[in-house]
């Protein structure tokens, strides 16, 4: 369901003039000559690069230019590339390395802490500062030249069960920081911080603290915003996906739809006020979230130029919304999903009561890891395809009343799953092609380029180059499990592909021409 806050959303009549192409480029932040300066590459979340030096015709010729071993856990972060420096993270660690040679410029190690060390998404860079979130829910500002700490502020109380893996989103003078925490019954929060001082500017609650008058979440907590959002400067709206409600599997303890959990919310970055919200899964009892990336596209839909936001959600459904208002335009499954009986008038799947967690277990698809997850999709404007790492999987969900109404409040067990990269037609939701990625769930996101290439990883530890038009394999390399989204950058006239495999970063490029 979409809820619109009166007077806040820009009408479609005020939208910018669209170009004559079917899908237009939403120019929101400059991808400085070949750099990758934000988590998604730009504000749209499309993860589409304009670089064209590496093509379908020559990608088989790329060779390893450099590698960098972190010595820590699996890299799940998107590297940031700015001013010839690569910034990459792991829990408690930030590295600055030379983008030409992988020479380490500095390394920051956060003090030992009792936070939850599940992974890390990356940093934000602003002027001469690098911003990093910590496992115990702090935000640290580092000097971009030296790695020295400028300031350190608390975003949320780790003793209550909050942590952060979030790559902050910088919107003008607002640094938006999300947290996680669904082992406890905690309200979902997104905090805006002054990047100069660390002072809190505002806090948005997806589920208000218990006891809040007129609480729209129907007594649920949760709805954490742990993934990096997207931004439309023309509407001045930030789009963020929210997580699951808590207690996670105990639905009877939180009757109702549980707004704004499992939702896409549109917020004013200057005030934190909600413009509208769309709930992808009402009353979620399977830990599916809707934290996945809200991708912004300016395109023709149903014959009309429209400002769109689309999401391949963890519940196995693909959504296309009008981002002026949050009105649903399309809802289609993109992965195996047996938990709904249909789609309601607001574009939301209708839950099947027979698939609710039960004492004797219920076989449900997707499983707890979802039809997709944190791994980012990519939108290719030339083909109009959203490339999504999909997971077809079943799990058995249990609910036991004696587990109570706190935290997880039940159990679930994955049974079987396979992965595929699926190319979704944004106008119909149809799968135009798919490329099998193997047994289990892939941890790799997706990158597309203007030359017609798609990069991702499979479950066997290979990074892949595919032809975007049909999914044909053009190149691959075994590097260990890929847990992040590939990026690309250009430096000194040379295009690089940068991917994390295991605990190392690998950069490929075409052979240098003889001088």
Where are these regions (language model features)?
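Phosphate/diphosphate-binding loops
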Residues: 295-335, 359-367, 502, 510
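Structural recognition of the beta-propeller blade-terminating site
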Residues: 98, 143, 194, 268, ...
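Bacterial N-terminal signal peptides
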Residues: 12-25
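Beta-propeller blade signature
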Residues: 188-198, 257-271, 419-425
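Loop/turn-rich, solvent-exposed surfaces of beta-rich toroidal or solenoidal domains
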Residues: 391, 415-468
């Amino acid at each position: 369901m979409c809820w619109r806050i009166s007077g806040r959303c820009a009408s479609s009549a005020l939208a910018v003039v669209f170009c004559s192409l079917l899908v237009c480029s939403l120019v929101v932040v400059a991808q400085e000559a070949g750099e990758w300066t934000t988590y998604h590459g730009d504000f749209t979340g499309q993860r589409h690069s304009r670089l064209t030096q590496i093509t379908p015709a020559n990608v088989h010729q790329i060779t390893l230019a450099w590698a960098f071993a972190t010595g820590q856990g699996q890299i799940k972060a998107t590297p940031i590339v700015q001013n010839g420096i690569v910034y990459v993270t792991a829990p408690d660690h930030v590295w600055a390395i030379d983008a030409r040679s992988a020479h380490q410029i500095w390394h920051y190690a956060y003090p030992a802490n009792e936070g939850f060390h599940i992974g890390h998404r990356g940093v934000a860079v602003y002027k001469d500062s690098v911003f990093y979130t910590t496992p115990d829910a702090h935000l640290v500002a580092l000097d971009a030249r030296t790695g020295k700490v400028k300031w350190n502020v608390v975003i949320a109380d780790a003793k209550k069960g909050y942590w952060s893996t979030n790559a902050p989103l910088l919107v003008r003078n607002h640094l938006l920081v999300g947290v996680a925490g669904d082992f406890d019954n905690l309200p979902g929060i997104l905090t805006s911080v002054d990047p100069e001082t660390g002072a809190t500017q505002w806090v948005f609650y997806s589920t208000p603290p218990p006891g809040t008058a007129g609480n729209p979440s129907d007594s649920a907590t949760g709805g954490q915003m742990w993934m990096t959002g997207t931004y439309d400067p023309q509407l001045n709206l930030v789009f963020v996906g929210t997580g699951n409600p808590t207690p996670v599997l105990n639905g009877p303890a939180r009757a109702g739809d549980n707004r704004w959990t499992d939702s896409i919310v549109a917020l004013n970055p200057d005030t934190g006020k909600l413009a509208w919200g769309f709930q992808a899964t009402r009353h979620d009892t399977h830990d599916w979230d809707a934290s996945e990336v809200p991708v912004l596209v300016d395109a023709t839909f149903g014959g009309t130029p429209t400002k769109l936001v689309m999401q391949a959600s963890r519940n196995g459904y693909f959504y296309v919304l009008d981002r002026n208002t949050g009105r649903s335009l399309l809802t289609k499954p993109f992965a195996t999903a047996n938990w709904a009986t249909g789609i309601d008038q607001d574009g939301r799947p209708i839950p099947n009561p027979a698939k609710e967690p039960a004492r004797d277990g219920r076989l449900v698809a997707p499983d707890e890891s979802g039809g997709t997850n944190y791994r980012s999709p990519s939108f290719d404007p030339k083909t109009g395809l959203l490339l999504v790492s999909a997971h077809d999987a079943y799990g058995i969900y249990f609910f036991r009343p004696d587990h109570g109404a706190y935290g997880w409040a039940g159990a679930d067990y994955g049974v079987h799953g396979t992965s595929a990269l699926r190319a979704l037609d944004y106008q119909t939701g149809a799968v135009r092609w798919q490329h099998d990625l193997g047994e289990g769930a892939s941890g790799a996101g997706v990158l597309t380029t203007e030359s017609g290439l798609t990069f991702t990883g499979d479950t066997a530890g290979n990074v892949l180059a595919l032809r975007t038009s049909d999914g044909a394999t053009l190149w691959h390399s075994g590097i260990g499990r890929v847990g992040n989204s590939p990026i690309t950058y250009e430096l000194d006239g040379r295009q690089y592909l940068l991917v994390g495999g295991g605990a190392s970063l690998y950069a490929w490029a075409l052979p240098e021409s003889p001088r």
